[in-house]
Amino acid sequence: MAEEQARHVKNGLECIRALKAEPIGSLAVEEAMAAWSEISDNPGQDRATCKEEEAGSSGLSKPCLSAIGSTEGGAPRIRGQGSGESDDDAETLGIPSRNLQASSTGLQCYHVYDHSGEAVKGIQDADSIMVQSGLDGDSTLSGGDDESENSDVDIGEPDTEGYAITDRGSAPISMGFRASDVETAEGGEIHELLKLQSRGNNFPKLGKTLNVPPPPNPSRASTSETPIKKGHRREIGLIWNGDRVFIDRWCNPMCSKVTLGTIRARCTCGECPRVCEQCRTDTGVDTRIWYHNLPEIPE
């Protein structure tokens, strides 16, 4: 398998060198393109002719010459190997040897396959070389040995007989998105979404909204939004003396903090009244023991 591949590559390089040594004219290029167009329309006819030519040959050492049509002078156009082709093959098909150099396209297709039988992509073939019109002695052909490894030519899918069907009318293959490009695009979209959300944009048109509750304000956490009603509140205390339970009741300002113990609190807002209706009837105001802070409460 490796020797066969090496032979295919060697033959292809020989074709390229022959074309570089003796460039073909623009008329031959136009005829070659027309010939390949006819072959792509009727691939079965070309394969049948190639089978007959390969019946007496040992492999790909000789090109497959097929009559494709007739030129203006009546001689058919052929597909040959170039200037290195012998005149014996032309005489076999009835073509004069003097017209072989003018009518031959000089394009021979060699394909390289791996050990599994799949065509190796990225190998530029001799049939992919495009010759510019009006070539002079100093002009060079596009392609060649230096570009054979970096080519993007699709050699097609090989059939059961080893021929590759090349679609010359297909559009060039476009590069796809990489995974890193997709991740970058998604990350940029999320970043833009958060950036606009911080500015107060709720995306009414796009339908994208990030509802983030505002952080609590520590200064407003301890105070209520509604003002405290001014006045007094009634407090109740239970006293256990070992035999009985005594219930004591008294009043404190509404704005004062509720604490443990019998404490007479003071007004902090300055608007609560000193006495209320219940304070006036309280008989223990003068006899009650008031504790002003927690350490004063006996255990």
Swiss-Prot record:
It comes from the Viruses. Residues 133-143 have a biased composition (Low complexity). Residues 144-160 have a biased composition (Acidic residues). One of its GO terms (cellular component) is host cell cytoplasm. It is found in: Host cytoplasm. Changing residue 240 to A: Impaired interaction with host STAT2. Loss of ability to block IFN-alpha/beta signaling. Belongs to the paramyxoviruses V protein family. Pfam families: Paramyxo_P_V_N, zf-Paramyx-P. Interacts with host IFIH1/MDA5 and DHX58/LGP2; these interactions are involved in the inhibition of the host type I interferon signaling pathway. Interacts with host TYK2; this interaction inhibits the type I interferon signaling pathway without affecting the type II pathway. Interacts with host IRF7; this interaction inhibits IRF7 translocation to the nucleus. Interacts with host CHUK. Interacts with host RELA/p65; this interaction inhibits the nuclear translocation of NF-KappaB. One of its GO terms (biological process) is symbiont-mediated suppression of host JAK-STAT cascade via inhibition of STAT2 activity. The record marks 240, 246, 248, 250 as: Interaction with host STAT2. Zn(2+) 2 binds at residues 255, 267, 269, 272. InterPro entries: Paramyx_V_Zn-bd, Paramyxo_P/V_N. The keyword Zinc-finger does not apply. The lineage of its organism: Viruses, Riboviria, Orthornavirae, Negarnaviricota, Haploviricotina. Keywords: Host cytoplasm, Host-virus interaction, Inhibition of host innate immune response by virus, Inhibition of host interferon signaling pathway by virus, Inhibition of host IRF7 by virus, Inhibition of host MDA5 by virus, Inhibition of host RLR pathway by virus, Inhibition of host STAT2 by virus, Interferon antiviral system evasion, Metal-binding, Viral immunoevasion, Zinc. The N-terminus interacts with host JAK1 and STAT1. The C-terminus interacts with host STAT2. The C-terminus also interacts with host PP1. Residues 110-120 are annotated as: Interaction with host STAT1. It comes from Measles virus (strain Ichinose-B95a) (MeV). This is Non-structural protein V. One of its GO terms (molecular function) is metal ion binding.
